[in-house]
Swiss-Prot record:
Disruption phenotype: Deletion mutant shows a severely reduced secretion of VgrG1a, VgrG1c as well as Hcp1. Forms transient higher-order structures that correlated with dynamics of sheath component TssB1. Interacts with TssA1. Pfam families: T6SS_VasE. Core component of the H1 type VI (H1-T6SS) secretion system that plays a role in the release of toxins targeting both eukaryotic and prokaryotic species. Functions as a spatio-temporal marker for assembly of contractile apparatus made of TssB1 and TssC1. This role in assembly depends on TssM1. This is Type VI secretion system baseplate component TssK1. The lineage of its organism: Bacteria, Pseudomonadati, Pseudomonadota, Gammaproteobacteria, Pseudomonadales. InterPro entries: T6SS_TssK. Transmembrane segments: none annotated. It comes from Pseudomonas aeruginosa (strain ATCC 15692 / DSM 22644 / CIP 104116 / JCM 14847 / LMG 12228 / 1C / PRS 101 / PAO1).
Length: 444
């Protein structure tokens, strides 16, 4: 016979306490078996508050707690069950976890003891209380023996194998003044991230970081009219950030929110960000979700997201405005001088002449140099910085049919003059009707 089989009720049977006890076990097993498969990690705290005053005396005590034990037993302290006796932590306990425990049900073991008896392996303490008849028209009360759950605070030295236990806190040490030092990084198993303040705080922090990055990206996308690969990358990243911000905002307001649901979204987001921020464009191997060790599960993912959102993603292609001056001179001023050493420069030329003619004659009719030396290059007929025709438009900048693309020769002797210059100058000597110039810097 199974200890959890249902009772076969029949008319005229002589009822004994064993019938109801067996029926209770059957119902509890039925509910546990039906619910256990619905959610992995279906145990932990929904609420947890410790007594801070007793910590200074070397004791750990629970003020209030609500949740579910690993065996499926729900608890609500102190509303339904009394808080366990405070645990006087020994000085020898270092980096040890304190657990909230309840003895497991075992065949042949006494399940309930009377108030005042030694607990032994009992799960319940019987107390007689006056209970009102809810269906009576007048006040009608009767004494009823009620069993409250007999919780204990335990450490691993107490033999956790006989208990349904859930971690409460990790004690770093008991200091010389007898006060307990708790590990602030420890996260107990929870059913709602509200019971684990570091997780709830990170959800709000992430929402703020995503909003800031989204605003910066949106401003850059709106201000840009490039249409090249760089802007497409910004659009894709903005799409990712917008989706993540909306989802994170939703999750930060949902209660209860199981940590596994939060982890699933965070690890997916961290993997997506690697496409834009990781040098190999691939995510690292993140830890498998462990409900009994939330800190080890979340810490690497939280770090990866902070790093991804702190990374400055510069535009690969930067449009540099060209201003037409007198005597065929066009000037492009540089606001970021680091581009001289870290970027290649492309001049895009469009005119109402055949493309092959433009490709062959424009480099001969144009002189390129620094704004300070362009006059000398023209007057002394010096070559300046060479223009190298490009077979195709670089993928980082927009392609326009009919335009010809020239790369500035960084190997030119005049290139060093740009180090201390305000920008580039272009002198166009020939006649090119409908001439239109665009200038781009492409980061290496």
């Amino acid at each position: 016979m199974s200890w959890n089989n249902r009772v076969v009720w029949s008319e005229g049977m002589f009822l004994r306490p064993q019938h109801f006890q067996q029926h209770d076990r059957y119902l509890e097993t039925l509910v546990d078996g039906r619910c256990r498969s619905l959610l992995a990690g279906g145990w932990g705290f929904s609420e947890l508050k410790l007594d801070d005053a007793l910590l200074t005396q070397g004791k750990l005590a629970i003020v209030s707690a609500r949740g579910v034990l690993p065996d499926g037993t729900p608890f609500n302290i102190p509303a339904d069950d009394p808080a366990p006796a405070p645990l006087n932590v020994e000085e020898s306990l270092r980096d040890g976890i304190v657990y909230l425990g309840l003895p497991l049900k075992r065949v042949g073991t006494r399940d309930t003891v009377e108030e005042g008896e030694a607990l032994g392996g009992a799960r319940y303490v019987s107390q007689v209380q006056e209970v009102r008849d809810d269906n009576a028209a007048f006040e009608s009360r009767a004494p009823v023996a009620l069993g409250s759950q007999a919780f204990r605070l335990l450490t691993e030295r107490d033999g956790l194998g006989e208990y349904a236990a859930v971690g409460v806190a990790r004690v770093r040490e008991k200091r010389a003044d007898q006060a307990l030092s708790l590990d602030e990084d420890y996260l107990p198993p929870v059913l709602d991230i509200a019971a684990a303040p570091p997780l709830a705080s990170f959800a709000k922090e992430l929402l703020g970081l995503l909003h800031q990055r989204g605003e910066a990206l949106a401003g850059r996308v709106v201000a840009s009219s490039a249409g090249g690969a760089s802007e497409i990358a910004d659009f894709l990243l903005l799409q990712l950030v917008n989706r993540a911000e909306a989802l994170t905002g939703h999750l930060s307001r949902v209660r209860p929110l199981h940590p596994q649901e939060l982890y699933r979204e965070l690890v997916a987001l961290a993997g997506e960000f690697c496409t834009f921020t990781a040098s190999q464009r691939r995510p690292e191997e993140y830890p498998v979700y462990n409900h009994d060790d939330l800190a080890a599960s979340f810490a690497p993912v939280m770090l990866a997201l902070r790093q991804a959102l702190a990374t400055v993603i510069d535009a690969k292609a930067i449009a540099i405005p060209i201003v037409e001056k007198a005597y065929g001179v066009h000037v492009a001023m540089l606001s970021d001088r680091s581009l001289i050493d870290n970027a290649s420069f492309v001049l895009v030329v469009r005119a109402d002449v055949p493309g092959e003619s433009l490709r062959g004659h424009f480099p001969q009719q144009a002189k390129v140099g620094s704004v300070e030396h362009i006059r000398d290059l023209v007057n002394l007929q010096l070559p300046g910085i060479g223009l190298l025709p490009m077979p195709v438009a670089p993928r980082q900048i927009p392609y326009h049919a009919g335009s010809t693309y020239f790369e500035l020769d960084r190997g030119s002797a005049h290139w060093k003059q740009l180090t201390h210059s305000g920008g580039f100058a272009f002198h166009i000597a020939g006649q090119f009707p409908g001439l239109n110039l665009a200038f781009w810097a492409i980061r290496g």
